[in-house]
Amino acid sequence: MELAQEARELGCWAVEEMGVPVAARAPESTLRRLCLGQGADIWAYILQHVHSQRTVKKIRGNLLWYGHQDSPQVRRKLELEAAVTRLRAEIQELDQSLELMERDTEAQDTAMEQARQHTQDTQRRALLLRAQAGAMRRQQHTLRDPMQRLQNQLRRLQDMERKAKVDVTFGSLTSAALGLEPVVLRDVRTACTLRAQFLQNLLLPQAKRGSLPTPHDDHFGTSYQQWLSSVETLLTNHPPGHVLAALEHLAAEREAEIRSLCSGDGLGDTEISRPQAPDQSDSSQTLPSMVHLIQEGWRTVGVLVSQRSTLLKERQVLTQRLQGLVEEVERRVLGSSERQVLILGLRRCCLWTELKALHDQSQELQDAAGHRQLLLRELQAKQQRILHWRQLVEETQEQVRLLIKGNSASKTRLCRSPGEVLALVQRKVVPTFEAVAPQSRELLRCLEEEVRHLPHILLGTLLRHRPGELKPLPTVLPSIHQLHPASPRGSSFIALSHKLGLPPGKASELLLPAAASLRQDLLLLQDQRSLWCWDLLHMKTSLPPGLPTQELLQIQASQEKQQKENLGQALKRLEKLLKQALERIPELQGIVGDWWEQPGQAALSEELCQGLSLPQWRLRWVQAQGALQKLCS
C-alpha cells in the first residue's frame, strides 16, 4: 500500500513539477520498481527537495511576502486599513440608519399633522356643539312659558273634547221648569240674564237723561264685569256644541213664551209668520256656520275690549277738557262768530291730537315690524347654522358608518384568510408535491447509481433528502470539473487552483474571481515596486558623488527614521480624527433629529409652514450642513 502511494506521488511529481506530458508518463509498475529498496529514500529526498523553477519562484515569493507581512510597519498599515474599512462600514450603516430615521420621522410627522388636524376639527365641532347646546337651552328656556300655556290650553281643549262627546239632553219645553237643568243651560241662562241687565243699565239712563253713562259708574261697571266673567267661565268650562245647543233651547223657550203670549190676541200667526218669510226665501243661499260666526264675533269683541280701556281713558280726559272749555265759553258768553272759531279751533286740536296719536301708533308698528324682521333674520341664521351642523353630523355619521363597515369587512377577510390559504395549499401545492415526489425519488435513485460509478466526486451533500437530517448544506457546491484529473479542462482548473494556492475542492466558477483579485494584488505590488525604484533612483541622483558607504547608510537610516516619525504622526492624526468623528456621531444624529422634528418637514412647495416655504427650509438645511461640516472639521 505504501509502495503504491509512493509510486503515485512520484507520477504526480513528474507531471506537475517536471512538466512530463500525460502520454509520456511511465506506467505504475515502472514507478513501483523505482521506489523499491534504496531507491525509495532517494526518490523521497528528490520529491521533497527538487522542484521546478516555477515552484521555486513561488516559494521564494511566498517567503518574501510572508517576511513583508511580518514587518511591524506593514502589519500596522494593514490594521489601520482594516480599521478604516470598518469605520467606513460603520459610517455607511449610520447613514442607512439616519435615512431610516428620517423616513420614520417623516411618517411620524405626517401622522402627527393628521392627528393635529383631526384634533382641531374635533375641538371646533365640540365648540360648535357646545354653542348650539347653549342656544338650544336658551331657546328651551324662552319656550318654556309658551309651552306651559299651550299645555294648559291643550288640557282644556282635551277636557272640552271629552265633554263634547257627552250628549246633553235639555228635556221638553213644557216641563223645563219642573225638572233639573243641565249645568251648561244654567250657565247660558245666567250669561243671558247678565247681558240683559247690562243692556238695561246701558240704555235706561240714556232714555231718562239723554247722556251716555261713563265706565266708572259703579252699577254699570259691575254688571259689565259680571257679564264678561260669566261668558269667560261659560266658554272655558263647556264645549261650543253644548253652548250652541243651550242657546237654541233658550231660543225655543223664548219663542214658545212669545207664542203663548200672542195666542190670546190672535197676533201669533201674523207676527210669527213675518220673520219666517225671509227664511224661506233665503234657504237656498249658503250661510256661514254658527261656529265661524261665534269665533268671528269673539275675535272682534277681543279686539274691541283691548282697545276699549285706552279709548275710555282718552275719552274721559277729552270730555273733562271739553266740559271745562264749554263752561269757560259759557262764562264769557262770546258771539256767534267767535263761538264758531272756537269750535273750529277745538275741532282742529282734536283732529291734530288724533293725527299725532295715529302717527305715534304707526311709528310703534314700524319699530315692532323692524324688531320682528331682525328676530326673523336671527332665526334664519340660527336655522342655517343648525342645518349646517346637522349636515356635518350626518357626514360624520356616514364616515363612521363606512369605517365600521370597512373594519367589519377587513375582520371578515382576515377570518377567511387562513382557510383560503389552507384551501389554496390543498388545491395547488399538495397535488404538485404529490406529482413531483415520484420524479424526485427516481432522480435520487439515478443519482445514487451514478455516484457508484464516480468515486472521486464528493456528492454527499446532494444525496441528502432534507437539509436537517445530517449536516447543514455547504455554501459552495462541488464543481463538475472535478470529475477526474485526466479530463481536458479538469487538469487546467486543477493546475490553476494549485498555482493560486486554493484547496482542490474549490469550484471552478470561483477560481476566476480569486485569480482576478490576485491579479489586482500583483499590479499593486508592481506599482509599489516601481515607486520604490523611483525613490531609490531619485535618492541616488540627489546625493552628492563621492560619499562613503557609511555616510550613505546613516543618511538612509535618518530618512527612514524621519519617514517612520512622519508616518506615525500621520497615523496619530488619523486616529484622532477617527475618534473625534466617532464622538461627534451622536451629536450629528441629534442635530439631524432636531432638524427633522421642525415643522419644515410638513411644508409643501406651494404652501407656507410657519412663515417659510420649502426652498427657504432647504436653504436652512444647507446652512445647517455647512455649520455641521465646520464643526466636524
Swiss-Prot record:
Tell me where in this chain the PTM Phosphoserine is found. S71
Q: Where in the cell is it found?
A: Cytoplasm, Cytoskeleton, Microtubule organizing center, Centrosome; Cytoplasm, Cytoskeleton, Spindle
Q: Does the keyword Ion transport apply?
A: no
Q: Show the segment(s) annotated as Disordered.
A: 264-286
> Which residues in this protein are found as N-acetylmethionine?
M1
Q: Which Pfam families match?
A: HAUS5
Recite the UniProt keywords alphabetically: Acetylation, Cell cycle, Cell division, Coiled coil, Cytoplasm, Cytoskeleton, Microtubule, Mitosis, Phosphoprotein
Main location class:
cytoplasm
Q: Which GO terms describe its biological process?
A: cell division; centrosome cycle; regulation of microtubule nucleation; spindle assembly
Q: Which residues does UniProt call coiled coil?
A: 73-110, 375-403, 551-592
Which GO CC annotations does the UniProt entry carry? centrosome; cytosol; HAUS complex; mitotic spindle microtubule
Establish whether keyword Secreted is in the entry: no
As for family, the record states:
Belongs to the HAUS5 family.
Q: How does it assemble?
A: Component of the HAUS augmin-like complex. The complex interacts with the gamma-tubulin ring complex and this interaction is required for spindle assembly. Interacts with EML3 (phosphorylated at 'Thr-881').
Question: What does the UniProt record say this protein does?
Answer: Contributes to mitotic spindle assembly, maintenance of centrosome integrity and completion of cytokinesis as part of the HAUS augmin-like complex.
Name the UniProt record assigns to this protein = HAUS augmin-like complex subunit 5
**Which species is this UniProt entry from?**
Homo sapiens
Q: Which gene encodes it?
A: HAUS5
